[in-house]
């Protein structure tokens, strides 16, 4: 998928170059704008006959450039360059939205009357966009170390200085500006070609076979505390290991507590494929101790599906299940569009666009949904945003797999505690009855029970197996 992203990004830059060169047709459709002294932006002035065409082409060129940047996979130490190129795209879009009132250089009467604020905004956006593009050219040339890129950069700088001098002299600005825009368009095509021939970035392994109990690059991030019977904690969809710090602290005195981040979440490397129920079962099996030692699995939300499936598929390895506010596994038809989107998300999580969205909205969304800050900044990363979205899109498939598994594999006779938060009935009583489980209701708690009442979770784990369990 990373290669396809490069192709899409390159295509966007080529589209931006073509749309940004629409002024070439204006030499024939708008003869009122002087080719030698007239500024190219005058073709889109409000009083020109083809203003809508050239304004639209400028705006779409800017959006295509910004979209191209958003689709580029992240590369270390290049963020300033791509940020500058995205700024150029946005400034170009703004210039298309706010056109000149009249042909400033070609129309001698234009300067004699007052102009609107949109006229000044267009001039400001044009100047800032040019500065941003030149900065991107310099920064990318320094990173790529290509003489071709440096050639375009120096020619672009020279054309910009020549255009500024011609504007000050009010003679020859049209020729200089057209040369400048031509160089900029050719450089965008060069960027597209560079992306098409570049090597794919290395993708860290993220399969269950690559799990590393010490965390690190080779596998998911794992935190282990204490000694004693093993307790394996799996967070809800999109959750992180630090959400369970209070519960782990209460259990670490008597238990060996294992917390981890699924692929793409927390400090784990990004996922390479959409999540599935059986992948998560394999992950739990890889983290749990080998038979004959057994593990107590604590799961939250939809991750309770993973824990239940693990118990059905590996009954001899489970000592107890604690299901914290489990999500209902309802029978709904899996969505083909969701599957298609899910296949793209692991790659999209590594793009500059996902990074920008996560930086802007991630911490605020996390605080709104969970109610606590993000001390490690993990929700400011694109991979976490993509992984959380991927898990949400995979819910229907996971639920369907669990429902089939319930029909095929009996539930073992292990103690189960279902902790239910206050709020709407999510079928916890029915689940507890089906699993012969103890049902603990906490009407004063919200969904984040591990944060609001960690003692209740610890008590459910430390309680003697089978106590209060319905026969």
Model feature map: region roles:
Residues 3-43, 47-198:
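Hydrophobic, aromatic-enriched alpha-helical segments typical of multi-pass transmembrane helices
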Residues 312, 321-354:
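Flexible "cap/lid" loop of the alpha/beta hydrolase fold
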Residues 442-454:
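Catalytic histidine-centered segment of alpha/beta-hydrolase-like enzymes
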Residues 220-267:
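Conserved HGGG/HGGXW glycine-rich cap/lid loop of the alpha/beta-hydrolase fold
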Residues 296, 319-322:
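Residue in the alpha/beta-hydrolase core beta-strand immediately N-terminal to the catalytic nucleophile
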């Amino acid at each position: 998928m990373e290669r396809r992203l490069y192709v899409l990004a390159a295509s966007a830059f080529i589209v931006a170059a073509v749309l940004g060169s629409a002024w070439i047709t204006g030499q024939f459709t708008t003869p009122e704008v002087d080719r030698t002294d007239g500024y190219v932006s005058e073709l889109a002035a409000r009083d020109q006959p083809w203003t809508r065409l050239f304004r639209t082409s400028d705006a779409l060129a800017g959006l295509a450039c910004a979209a191209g940047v958003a689709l580029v996979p992240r590369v270390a130490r290049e963020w300033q360059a791509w940020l500058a190129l995205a700024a150029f795209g946005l400034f170009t879009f703004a210039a298309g939205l706010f056109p000149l009132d009249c042909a400033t250089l070609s129309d001698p009467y234009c300067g004699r009357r007052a102009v609107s604020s949109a006229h000044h905004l267009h001039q400001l956006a044009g100047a800032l966009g040019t500065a941003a593009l030149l900065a991107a050219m310099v920064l990318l040339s320094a990173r790529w170390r290509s003489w071709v890129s440096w050639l375009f950069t120096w020619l672009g700088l020279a054309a910009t200085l020549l255009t500024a001098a011609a504007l000050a002299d009010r003679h020859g600005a049209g020729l200089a500006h057209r040369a400048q825009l031509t160089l900029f368009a050719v450089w965008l095509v060069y960027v597209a070609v560079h992306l098409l021939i570049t090597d794919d970035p290395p993708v860290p392994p993220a399969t269950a076979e690559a799990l590393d109990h010490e965390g690190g690059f080779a596998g998911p991030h794992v935190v282990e505390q204490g000694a004693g019977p093993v307790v394996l904690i799996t967070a809800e969809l999109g959750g992180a290991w630090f959400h369970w710090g209070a519960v782990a602290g209460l259990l670490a005195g008597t238990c060996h507590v294992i917390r981890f981040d699924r692929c793409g979440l927390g400090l784990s490397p990004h996922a390479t494929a959409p999540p599935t129920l059986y992948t998560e079962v394999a992950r739990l099996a890889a983290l749990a101790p080998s038979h004959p030692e057994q593990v107590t699995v604590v799961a939250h939300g939809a991750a309770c599906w993973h824990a239940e499936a693990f118990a059905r598929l590996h009954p001899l390895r489970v000592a107890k299940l604690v299901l914290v506010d489990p999500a209902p596994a309802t029978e709904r038809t899996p969505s083909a569009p969701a599957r298609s989107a899910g296949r793209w998300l692991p790659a999209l999580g590594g793009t500059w666009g996902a990074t920008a969205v996560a930086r802007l909205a991630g911490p605020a969304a996390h605080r709104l949904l969970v109610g606590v800050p993000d001390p490690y900044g993990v929700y400011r990363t694109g991979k976490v945003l993509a992984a959380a979205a991927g898990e949400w899109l995979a819910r229907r498939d996971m639920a369907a797999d669990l429902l089939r598994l319930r029909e095929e594999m009996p539930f073992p006779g292990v103690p189960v505690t279902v902790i239910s938060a206050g709020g709407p009935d999510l079928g916890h009583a029915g689940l507890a009855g089906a699993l012969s489980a103890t049902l603990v209701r906490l009407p004063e708690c919200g969904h984040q029970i591990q944060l609001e009442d960690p003692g209740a979770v610890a008590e459910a784990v430390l309680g003697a197996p089978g106590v209060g369990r319905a026969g």
